[in-house]
């Protein structure tokens, strides 16, 4: 009986620990959802949309220092509310404690519940770029929320590139910038070639029908899985989970069999939006303190090219934190796990103006 009681007590203790861990990852206020209509929105092409819908979420009180968080390609504001990201950042005592910050999570133009081709315009939707996406975000922040200055702009992957653009295009709008898994330079090398192949694979699929399909092209899922494996995940991590051909086939088959509820036109527009990205010419205009966070095994932004070291010299108050590669990191996806960099963020914010 004593042994049984000890086992039950241990099990109960373990359950309490699991409950505590789950609670600590979710101890921030419930996100509030809202929509903003940007009227007469002008795209870089000169096209004007009478009403552009921007969906967003906020956490915390508007009177607190504001933090703008920008998601990656094919993501949304909701995609940033994972245990590995929000659960490491927004809770009590964490770097972006939602009791002390006003956190803004927009769905970028073309993504989530914001205006996008699949709403009905299909390929007649303006061919937007990152500049348009940042312009929409700026109108959301200043017009819908009435904010003139942000404590922090932090973005991951596509959101990281947009963070660079925020610093260049709106240099007085924030105290601090944290672009992650992103470089300020134009698309080039393998990063662009893989994106081009992804886009062309769908556009050249007869099932796409120039964007007028009635069911999603078969190439959509294959192209997404191909691009994901080629440019994300980390070599060490893949080798760990797929050390044999049999296990590699199993992993690939599982990914190809998994549901992919995306729209081909939305998908194409989102990836194509990076085509003319280039924040590099304006780096000297950045006034905010900047912490660039990349991973040593990032397939899209390989550190061995030396791009970041060269470009950061042009930014007044900038430094980089490079996450060491390991079996735990996930290549380009590493920065989605805040455990690898949250202490760096905390120290950075303490040293930044207003910290």
Which ranges hold each PLM region?
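Conserved alpha/beta-hydrolase "acid-adjacent" motif
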Residues: 299-306
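Catalytic active-site module of serine/aspartate enzymes centered on a nucleophile-bearing elbow/loop
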Residues: 318-355
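Active-site nucleophile elbow and catalytic-triad environment of alpha/beta-hydrolase enzymes
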Residues: 266-282
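N-terminal cap/lid subdomain of alpha/beta-hydrolase-fold enzymes
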Residues: 57-119, 307
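Short beta-strand/loop motif that positions the catalytic acidic residue
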Residues: 286, 292-294
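Conserved acidic catalytic loop of the alpha/beta-hydrolase fold
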Residues: 131-151
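Alpha/beta-hydrolase-fold enzymes
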Residues: 173-257
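Conserved hydrolase catalytic core segment
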Residues: 150-188
């Amino acid at each position: 009986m004593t042994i049984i009681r000890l086992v039950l007590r241990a099990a109960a203790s373990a359950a309490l620990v699991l409950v505590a861990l789950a609670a600590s990852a979710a101890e921030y206020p419930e996100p509030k959802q809202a929509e903003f209509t940007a009227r007469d929105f002008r795209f870089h092409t000169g096209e004007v949309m009478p009403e552009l819908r921007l969906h967003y979420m906020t956490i915390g009180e508007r009177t607190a220092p504001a933090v703008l968080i920008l998601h990656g390609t094919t993501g949304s504001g909701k995609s940033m509310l994972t245990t590995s990201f929000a659960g490491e950042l927004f809770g009590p005592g964490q770097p972006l404690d939602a009791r002390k910050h006003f956190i803004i999570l927009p769905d970028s133009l073309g993504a989530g519940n914001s205006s996008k081709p699949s709403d009905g315009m299909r390929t007649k939707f303006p061919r937007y770029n990152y500049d348009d996406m940042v312009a929409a975000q700026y109108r959301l922040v200043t017009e819908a929320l009435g904010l003139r200055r942000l404590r922090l702009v932090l973005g991951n992957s596509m959101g990281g590139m947009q963070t660079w653009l925020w610093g260049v295009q709106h240099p007085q709008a924030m105290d601090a910038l944290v672009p992650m898994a992103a470089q300020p330079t134009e698309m080039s090398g393998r990063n662009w070639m893989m994106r081009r192949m992804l886009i062309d694979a769908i556009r050249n699929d007869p099932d796409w029908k120039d964007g007028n399909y009635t069911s999603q092209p078969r190439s959509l899922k294959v192209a997404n899985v191909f691009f994901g494996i080629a440019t994300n995940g980390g070599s060490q991590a893949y080798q760990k989970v797929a050390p044999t051909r049999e296990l590699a086939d199993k992993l690939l088959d599982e990914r190809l069999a998994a549901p992919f509820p995306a729209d081909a036109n939305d998908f194409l527009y989102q990836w194509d939006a990076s085509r003319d990205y280039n924040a590099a010419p304006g780096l000297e205009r950045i006034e905010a303190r900047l912490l660039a966070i990349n991973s040593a095994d990032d397939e899209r932004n390989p550190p061995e090219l030396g791009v970041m070291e060269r470009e950061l010299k042009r930014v007044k108050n900038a430094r980089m934190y490079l996450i060491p590669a390991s079996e735990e990191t996930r290549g380009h996806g590493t920065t989605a796990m805040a455990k690898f960099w949250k202490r760096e963020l905390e120290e950075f914010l303490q040293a930044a103006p207003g910290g």
